[in-house]
Amino acid sequence: MNEEVFNRHEINYYLAESHYKSNNMEKANIIYKKLLDSMNSKYFSRSLNRVANIYLKQQDYNNSLIYYKKLEKNFKNNREKIESFIGILSNYFYLKKYDSVQLYSSRISQIENISFNNRNKINLLKAKSYLQNENKTAAIDMLINTINLVQDESAAEASYILAEIFFTEGKKTQALETLYSLNENFNTYENWVGNSYLLIAKIFISMDEKFQAKATLESLIDNTKIEEIKDLALNILNEIEDD
């Protein structure tokens, strides 16, 4: 590749990155795809990764899967290899191909040098797939594995899902204990903490503890910075007051 072509690829790549980081996904995608015309470019695999990720963000799971599978065959380093696998798993999950999630995750488990955070992403996808396939026992085991591996966002979500399972099974004390633990151990993940307090309020309502439910919701409304969580809390609070 001559220097002029290399410079053009470099300029295009960083222009695409600028659009990507500014959330101008359509413009970024057009430029990344131009960079895919040259497999010899050092920006080829990076652009594949971005295109696949953009389609995933746009919920175009079939196209995202296509590009992650291309990345799987053209990765330049271990990070891209692992990201291709997690991307493939994510798309299989959203496409409701739960058996494929289990099959692919068994392949990933054989790869070395996977960070705890990435292992937790994989564990969470497996757990959610088990739930969708109505294998609750396997799902609970995998959720607990996720929670115990490392205190990251996947573990926070796993804690919330586990509490939901306990609640639907009528194990309200276990559900509350799980949610209190979530709020204590994962307090930096505001979305999951907010959802946790919403579920705590619902559990209190189901126990006819309306005073505690109201106090929980009022505290959440006063403290959350997430408007969607605040709106949901207000709706539940209004329902209590209308009774």
Regions found by a protein language model. Give the residues of each.
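Acidic, polar-rich low-complexity tracts and alpha-helical solenoid repeat scaffolds
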Residues: 1-243
